[in-house]
A protein has these predicted regions:
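N-terminal flexible/basic segments that precede or flank functional cores
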Residues: 1-29, 33, 37-38, 43, ...
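Short secondary-structure capping/turn micro-motifs that flank functional sites
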Residues: 51, 90-93
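Short, conserved catalytic or interaction motifs in soluble domains
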Residues: 61, 87
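Short alpha-helical DNA-recognition segment
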Residues: 39-58
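DNA major-groove recognition helix of helix-turn-helix/homeodomain DNA-binding modules
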Residues: 69-84
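Alpha-helical residues within the helix-turn-helix
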Residues: 36, 47, 76
Length: 96
């Protein structure tokens, strides 16, 4: 049997970690804004999105780096498209 070695994920450089944190916080803020506009509790959104309420809370606090699948689940739970939910996220600094 041939062994396959996989590199361990390396920590992000500080600038990339800061950028990730900024985007996660902005995304979480949008999720919370849409949820409260619709007068949904965390529990209600979690049920609609088929996610755990603690996970949704962590997303809203900017503590989770979501998969595209979970972004899609949240968008559907809010009755939005992924594009609507991701609109107005911060632009990448210094990139065009």
């Amino acid at each position: 049997m041939t062994r396959v070695f996989v590199n361990k994920p390396q920590p992000l450089e500080a600038r990339f970690a800061q950028e990730r944190d900024r985007v996660q916080a902005a995304f979480g803020k949008r999720v919370r804004e849409f949820r409260t506009e619709q007068e949904l509790t965390l529990e209600m959104l979690a049920e609609k999105a088929d996610l755990h309420e603690n996970y949704v809370g962590a997303v809203e606090r900017g503590e989770r780096n979501l998969s595209l699948y979970n972004v899609w689940r949240l968008a559907n739970g809010l009755g939005l498209s992924v594009a609507d939910l991701g609109q107005d996220l911060p632009a990448r600094k210094g990139k065009r």
